Amino acid sequence: MTFTKIYHTPDGFDDMMMSSDGKLLTGLWFINSQDHSKHIMGLEEKDLPVFCGTKEWLDIYFSGRCPDFTPEYRIDGLTPFRKEVSDIMQSIQFGQTMTYGEIAALIAQKRCIRKMSAQAVGGAVGWNPICIIIPCHRVLGANRSLTGYGGGIKNKIALLKLEGIEFRKT
């Protein structure tokens, strides 16, 4: 069974949906985004301890501060490549960014190969089921340009501004 809870965000952001298996967070996405539409069938709304912890984390984050803890989560379907990309995204600090190309270069270096596809990295970034906590919004295109965002470009812009991140609108 999958349980859900709505998180009401501050003005300027779409509200969010949290999902859980009953113990761990299994999803966090903006409502009305392309990510949300994948997850809306067969869910039961319920108050759970993991939702309280996630709400606390989000409250701190949306106040413009970096939370000093991470809610416990589980990611289903995490391939080794997606895990590599997810681990790198989690290393991007509040207020910082990386490009798809920079992530690809790190993976290539780690694997001792000449080159890794930035487009493949983009696919793994876009797959992320736990937005903000795994900060896919901090990944930018070449020259710090905005690219698509599963949570909606409006939300990506607002998240980057909240963190004081400069970017180029394309």
Where are the regions a protein language model picked out?
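Short Lys/Arg-enriched helix C-cap and helix-to-coil transition segments
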Residues: 132-139
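Basic nucleic-acid-binding alpha-helical/helix-turn surface characteristic of O6-alkylguanine DNA
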Residues: 1-112, 116, 166-170
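…primarily DNA-binding HTH/wHTH and HhH modules…
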Residues: 142-170
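Flexible, gly/pro- and Lys/Arg-enriched active-site loops
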Residues: 113-119, 146-151
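A broad detector of the eukaryotic-type serine/threonine protein kinase catalytic domain
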Residues: 90, 108, 126, 141-144
